[in-house]
Regions:
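Catalytic Walker B motif of ABC-type/P-loop ATPase nucleotide-binding domains
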Residues: 184-188
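Conserved ABC transporter NBD signature motif
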Residues: 85-93, 101-102
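ABC transporter nucleotide-binding domain
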Residues: 202-282, 286-311
Length: 318
């Protein structure tokens, strides 16, 4: 869901986070020197990032490990204070108005949980509803709707520690939305999930963005998440914002080839021009769905060469 001209739900200006870490020297003398002198160096996790996210946007925030994605999310949500720069969420500073901002945002970290480990899942929901002062009628409506959309009914009475990764992630997403936030931050919500669990999470996120107008910022290493969910992509590397635009522009700027000629050590029988090569993406109602990655444009069995033409958009997904 993209709203042209909508007010900014999230604003970052010159956002910078610098960590000061100790410098370790080898040997006994190095340890003594570190103990006495306390030598340090600065590590720039995020180095001057600026962007706006409009209300109702679904934005992907991608980059390699250590690029600064999670640090950015933590500053946007008030978990970390920026070294310098400004952050606003719905016009409020997460650092100065923590309670007000907390009422308006939901946060999910794929490798952590806000659920109580030894309690049944339903108890965690009830505790969170009380913490956010959710009215009983709103809570019942939430439970009815989200139990159906996320399939929570099968494990509501199960302790969180006994949930599968897919079940826990669905429960964590529901918990982040229990107080009807206007902005949702998702840090790798599909990490470690199987194909079916990922599809269920993606479908749910699409619905709440489309039907409720929830603004979503998603970090992920799965390009399928970006392709299916996000109209806009931001790329961060070494703490710097390297790209901000749509997926098609990102693929074009990456310089992916559109054609390729291969010389093979041996030729498989049956290769013909016009044949498409692809992969199975999942099981649909009518059978297996397949996404073509490339088309054979020429075959020469004498020279043992095959020419391929790629679909750049589909070839970009893992």
């Amino acid at each position: 869901m993209s709203i042209v001209g909508a007010a900014a739900a999230v604003t970052a200006r010159g956002l910078r986070k610098v960590y000061r870490v100790g410098v370790r020297r080898p040997g006994l003398w190095g340890s003594i020197r570190q103990l006495v002198a306390g030598e340090t160096r600065d590590v720039i996790a995020v180095g001057g990032v600026s962007f706006d996210i409009s209300q109702g946007e679904f934005v992907g925030y991608i980059g390699p490990n250590g690029a600064g994605k999670s640090t950015t999310v933590k500053m946007l949500t008030g978990i970390l204070h920026p070294t310098c720069g400004q952050v606003q969420v719905n016009g409020l500073s997460p650092a100065r108005a923590r309670r007000q901002v907390a009422q308006q945002i939901g946060v999910v970290f794929g490798q952590r949980t806000q659920l109580w480990w030894d309690l049944p899942t339903i108890d965690s929901f009830e505790i969170l509803a009380a913490m956010y002062d959710v009215a009983p009628a709103d809570y019942r409506r939430f439970m009815d709707e989200f139990t159906e959309l996320l399939g929570l009914g099968e494990f509501l009475d199960t302790p969180v520690r006994r949930l599968s990764l897919g079940q826990r992630m669905r429960a964590d997403i529901a918990a982040a939305l229990i107080h009807a936030p206007r902005v949702l931050f998702l840090d790798e919500p599909t990490i470690g999930l199987d194909v079916m669990a990922k599809a269920q999470v993606r479908d749910f996120l699409t619905r709440i963005n489309r039907d409720r107008g929830v603004t979503i910022l998603l970090t992920t290493h799965d390009m399928r998440d970006i392709e299916e969910l996000c109209e806009r992509v931001m790329v961060i590397n070494h703490g710097k914002l390297m790209f901000d635009g749509n997926l098609e522009s990102l693929i074009a700027s990456a310089g992916l080839p559109t054609t390729m000629s291969l010389r093979l050590s041996s030729m498989a029988p049956g290769l013909v021009a016009g044949q498409t090569l692809g992969r199975t993406l999942g099981q649909a109602q009518g059978g297996a769905q397949e996404s073509a990655l490339c088309t054979i444009t020429a075959v020469d069995y004498t020279a043992r060469t095959v020419d391929l033409a790629f679909d750049r958009r589909k070839a970009s997904a893992p």
